[in-house]
Amino acid sequence: MEHLIKSGWRWFNEPAQWTGNTVTTDHDTDFWRTTHYGYVRDTGHILGVDKAGDFELTVTFAGNYREQYDQAGIAIRLDEKNWIKSGIELVDGGQQISAVVTREVSDWSVVELAEPAASVTIKAERTGDTVTISYGLNGGPPATMLRLAYFPPELSVLAGVMCASPIGKGFTTRFENISI
């Protein structure tokens, strides 16, 4: 990840521990706004680059998810009230492919995996006012659509990789093949 920082990428909520392509989340980190739980959190970790207009963001990652809601994947962040995160989230002991679209309040959708994935590839394609999220498992291409969502067009966003531990003490994720 050092090479990304040298090419203009930056941290939003930099974690205490990261090296190479590996990030260990800090405790009590998350991105969420209001829905169901009633709280607002803007403390998760993002390593991203500022992008305006259309783009495609793809990353492959693997994490040692341990505790409820441990999560890793991609993020597209306009501001604290407008963002998307998608990846794996550990829910009730199982890995879920997850997408949260937030426009003032968070809207969460999941697909339960029958078996834990060794790795996940997530692709977010921003075209005009739309972000399409697709995924692939265990080395497969991101060919399965998870979510099609409205997102404000043309505005510059922070786009990159994300991880967080809302409840747990932290876990480690390795990000590979990051491209935008």
Where would I find each of the regions flagged by the language model?
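Extracellular glycan-recognition regions
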Residues: 1-180
